[in-house]
Amino acid sequence: MSQVEISELAKEIRASLKQFPNFPSEGILFEDFLPVFTKPDLFQKLVRAFQLHVGEQKVDYVVGLESRGFLFGPTLALALGAGFVPVRKAGKLPGPVFTAEFQKEYGSDKFQIQKDVIEEGAKVLIVDDILATGGSASSAGELVKQTGGDIVEYLFVMELDFLNGRDKLDKPAFTLLSGQAEKLQN
């Protein structure tokens, strides 16, 4: 892995982000990474940075969390020669599913994964846009374990460090862009 190349790619990607103070609620600095997808070269750089990080590590599946993990998860899976598996909100997937509940800031939610899509012992990456409290990522990890998959690592574009979400994860986590160390000060 070329850490220097990953750092250079991260700088270019960070420069394209838009910031929105106090969105979606007071005290939050929302960093919108959607502009990355309006420029094909930046989108390719995002995928390339994650691909460089993963390196030669064998990956069978990339699991993307609804909904922003769906934006780059399939493209990363393709670049890695892996399959893509979605984790969705409850009631959105057909057939037999595993379900895991997780806590959000204002209540709880449920994620699901189809039961027959990941083979026992398959190597899995879990991807999402932001690591915040760690609840949704941890829930996705629980689902992968229920399928018999082996989590290799969690990958995120950004992290809200002050929420300590990585403490809820039982496997290594990589964040491409340096995170927010503290809550927005007004």
Curated annotation (Swiss-Prot):
Record localization: Cytoplasm; Nucleus
Provide the transmembrane region boundaries.
Answer: none
Identify the EC number(s). 2.4.2.7
**Reaction(s) catalysed (UniProt annotation):** AMP + diphosphate = 5-phospho-alpha-D-ribose 1-diphosphate + adenine
Provide the GO MF annotations for this entry: adenine binding; adenine phosphoribosyltransferase activity; AMP binding; metal ion binding
Fetch the CDD domains from UniProt. PRTases_typeI
Q: Which domain of life is it from?
A: Eukaryota
List cofactor names only.
Answer: Mg(2+)
Report residues binding AMP. Answer: 132-136
* Residue pairs linked by disulfide bridges in the UniProt entry: none
Q: In which pathway does it act?
A: Purine metabolism; AMP biosynthesis via salvage pathway; AMP from adenine: step 1/1
InterPro entries assigned: Ade_phspho_trans, PRibTrfase_dom, PRTase-like, UPRTase/APRTase
Entry's Pfam families?
Pribosyltran
Q: What does this protein do?
A: Catalyzes a salvage reaction resulting in the formation of AMP, that is energically less costly than de novo synthesis.
On subunit structure and binding partners, the annotation says: Homodimer.
Q: Which family does it belong to?
A: Belongs to the purine/pyrimidine phosphoribosyltransferase family.
Question: What is the name of the protein in this document?
Answer: Adenine phosphoribosyltransferase
What organism does the record attribute this protein to? Answer: Debaryomyces hansenii (strain ATCC 36239 / CBS 767 / BCRC 21394 / JCM 1990 / NBRC 0083 / IGC 2968) (Yeast)
Q: What is the lineage of its organism?
A: Eukaryota, Fungi, Dikarya, Ascomycota, Saccharomycotina
The gene name on file is APT1
